Amino acid sequence: LLQVENLRVSFKNEEKQYIETVKGISFSIPVNTTVALVGESGSGKSVTSLATMGLLPPESSQIALDSKILFEGKNLLDLPRREMRKKCGKDIAMIFQEPMSSLNPVFTVGSQIAEILQLHLGMSRKQARARALELLIEVGIPSPETKIDAYPGQLSGGQQQRVMIAMAIACKPKLLIADEPTTALDVTIQKQILDLLESLRKKHQMSMLFITHDLALVGEIADQVIVMRHGQIREQGRVKDVLERPQDVYTKALLHCRPQLSKRPMRLPMISDFMQQKGDDYIETHTIDVESLQQRSRGLTGQEEIILDVRDLKKSFYSRKGLFGKQEFQAVKGVSFQLAKGKTLGLVGESGSGKTTIGLLLMRLQEATGGKALFEGQDILAMSEKEFARYQRKIQIIFQNPYASLNPRFTVGQILMEPMQVHGIGMNDSERKQMALDLLERVSLPAQAFYRYPHEFSGGQRQRIAIARCLTLKPEVLICDESVSALDVSVQAQVLNLLQDLQDEFGLSYIFISHDLSVVKYISDQIM
């Protein structure tokens, strides 16, 4: 159905020079088959899919003249823009990673689905609305008769992704490209979306290109897999062969970096344990034997000192009902737990289960409706803001999204020094600067990072900056709110190892919030 031959894509850099990001890859997608394209951020997965859809920015990118993308024997790269627009959306459709960026917030979901049907299939407005309702039912949207008139912002993340799928299959495409469609979703919703995609693929006899950075998902949905790194294909073949008997060192490294439910090594293996860069190429190193890694014992003896004692914690939100009434929604319903000093409590649950709300309540970023949180014997929820300010530095939070939690107008140095200035840590700015530089070194970032801005760093590096910012205040409790869920597998391993090292060194206590069971089991002493 689709044949990619020697695809080479280049992008313009700041010096107006073209840098090759996809370096001569070739692969094919047979009819009625799912092919998974796996790789970390920057491997060229999304660029490959955008090139197939004709969505690369013409002013800053170029595709080599000898590259071909053949769809049913026709080279898509030779098609005029008008003909390409007819093909994309009808014969080839795409589901993007972030549904809220892809859906128009000021149009109802029904009108957005109907627009595609009117444009590509020439339906009347009435016909298109009726078909949009059928599609919402087909993708499993609850109460579709009401949701058809809802705006994207009124739907959950999983529901938004279902709407994106409905839009993609509206014209019964022959090829569906799914670009990281489950990355931001919790495990249960992720499974539902994967099952939905597979059932729709079989029902409509489509082929699918499934793009992901998570090798664990590949076995559930794909027939064949292609592993990419730095714009090149490292390995491709049948899923069973690649996952069970990987030939390439990078594929082996990716499989070993991920935490496993059955093992708890002292440190997670990292890509650098298996391969080292030498010029433009990589050499196999194998500095560790995965099977003989020292295991870490987890759990509590019952003799530990309790640093945080939460009792009957409650939080309610209220929404308007009618003209004068209000409706109560209980986000946290009488939760109690204890956190031992120097240990990790894992909080697991789906989206909307109240995990993040508990973290925000303990930070007093939201006010609790009821309950107590005893820190060193003092109820921090009952304190005035002035009293709590003394305790605030002892409890810190690492947020899920490192792109949103760092001030883009501040340099990393300013980001690290600001909390020290607020809390009076350090005699003067030169002492604070030295403390900040020491922390950057501790989280494995170069000293030059002090003078740079957040946008100049990758997601994993930004999360290290967020961790360093928390450490400036010498906290005793760190709340990690989905702090590794948006990261690539190898970067996730680096951050988990860093958190483990910091806990061993400073005796930190963690509340680790996640929807990933293997990660929680790896790092936690107790789970709730």
Predicted regions located by residue number:
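Conserved ABC transporter NBD signature motif
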Residues: 63-75, 371-379
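Conserved ABC ATPase "signature" region
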Residues: 127-146, 379, 430-448
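Short catalytic/signature loops enriched in Gly
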Residues: 142-146, 239-308, 319-323
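A short, proline-enriched helix->beta-strand linker immediately N-terminal to the Walker B motif
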Residues: 170-174, 472-476, 492
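ABC ATPase NBD coupling module
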Residues: 75-93, 119, 241-246, 323-326, ...
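Conserved signature/switch motifs of ABC ATPase nucleotide-binding domains
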Residues: 89, 153, 171, 455, ...
